[in-house]
Amino acid sequence: MKALVKREANKGIWLEQVPVPTPGPNEVLIKLEKTAICGTDLHIYLWDEWSQRTIRPGLTIGHEFVGRVAELGSAVTGYQVGQRVSAEGHIVCGHCRNCRGGRPHLCPNTVGIGVNVNGAFAEYMVMPASNLWLIPDQIPSELAAFFDPYGNAAHCALEFDVIGEDVLITGAGPIGIIAAGICKHIGARNVVVTDVNDFRLKLAADMGATRVVNVSKTSLKDVMADLHMEGFDVGLEMSGNPRAFNDMLDCMYHGGKIAMLGIMPRGAGCDWDKIIFKGLTVQGIYGRKMYETWYKMTQLVLSGFPLHKVLTHQLPIDDFQKGFDLMEEGKAGKVVLSWN
């Protein structure tokens, strides 16, 4: 079968022929229909410092997907061949304190598909049946293909009550863009998104952001004054940029709450005085709550949330290089690759 493989320990990704995997007793073989390129996949493609520490060359990458059940393991019940599914990309142990306590998204033994084990950029893949999520007929496959990052955005946006609140989102990548849309969809007052990429800021505006701010050209404080704001009630940090995070701390209202998804560089500092004396709450966000986030994000789409607005490119798998080039250049929202 075809698969996108990180064959060599340098920049690039390779379309190769690899064996079709065989499902174990509790696994399902999935025939992929569509997959989406994630920021993590771009890191692996670029072979940055994180990738060099984490990725084993020879790995089939990818973790955002939709497909159909092709074969059931001998012990699998509750699914049928032909059903359309996506899946939670974090495989958890099931026996640690957090798994047994109803917090599997915090499992310290998590294995990530397309990072630690072979992933979804292939014609077929195997997944534990317990990780599957059935996709309703009303949701098109090109949207279901990126439910994974949509879930990250939903986890962040729903972590704190944003109804009637002023929300600051630092980072207009696809997750930040989607989070902006969710916050407006559920009733935030003002949603302000910052970045330095005008293309992606426009996508955030199209998704419903009240104001988008290119911080290389415009002061966030000036925007706050224009909106008659004393400070932001909720912050969603998506950029992983220390300067953006410190700007957020500076602009938060006393008692504000921050959900952090962006991964900061090692040793990055922040103004702890602002966290302490403003009484801020800072909550780290990892993955999606299993499976409450999946339920809520599915219902959001079914209720009219315009997830399609972040989808900018659909390409056949043979044009995968164009997709990675668009992502590297910052000229895309979500890029979906078709395996049909």
UniProtKB/Swiss-Prot annotation:
Pathway recorded for this protein: Amino-acid degradation; L-threonine degradation via oxydo-reductase pathway; glycine from L-threonine: step 1/2
Active site location: T40 (charge relay system), H43 (charge relay system)
Molecular function terms from GO: L-threonine 3-dehydrogenase activity; zinc ion binding
Subunit structure: Homotetramer.
Enzyme class of the recorded protein, top EC level: oxidoreductase
Bilayer-spanning residue ranges: none
Protein's UniProt name: L-threonine 3-dehydrogenase
Entries under InterPro entries matching the protein: ADH-like_C, ADH-like_N, ADH_Zn_CS, GroES-like_sf, L-Threonine_3-DHase, NAD(P)-bd_dom_sf, PKS_ER, Zn_alcohol_dh
Any single GO BP term: L-threonine catabolic process to glycine
PROSITE patterns per the UniProt record, alphabetical: ADH_ZINC (PS00059)
Major subcellular location class: cytoplasm
Cofactor dependence: Zn(2+)
Membership in a protein family: Belongs to the zinc-containing alcohol dehydrogenase family.
Catalytic activity: L-threonine + NAD(+) = (2S)-2-amino-3-oxobutanoate + NADH + H(+)
Keywords, comma-separated and alphabetical: Cytoplasm, Metal-binding, NAD, Oxidoreductase, Zinc
Subcellular location: Cytoplasm
Binding residue positions for Zn(2+) 2: C93, C96, C99, C107
Domain of life: Bacteria
Note describing how the cofactor binds: Binds 2 Zn(2+) ions per subunit.
GO cellular component terms attached to this protein's record: cytoplasm
Residues binding NAD(+), per UniProt: I175, D195, R200, L261, G262, I263, I285, Y286
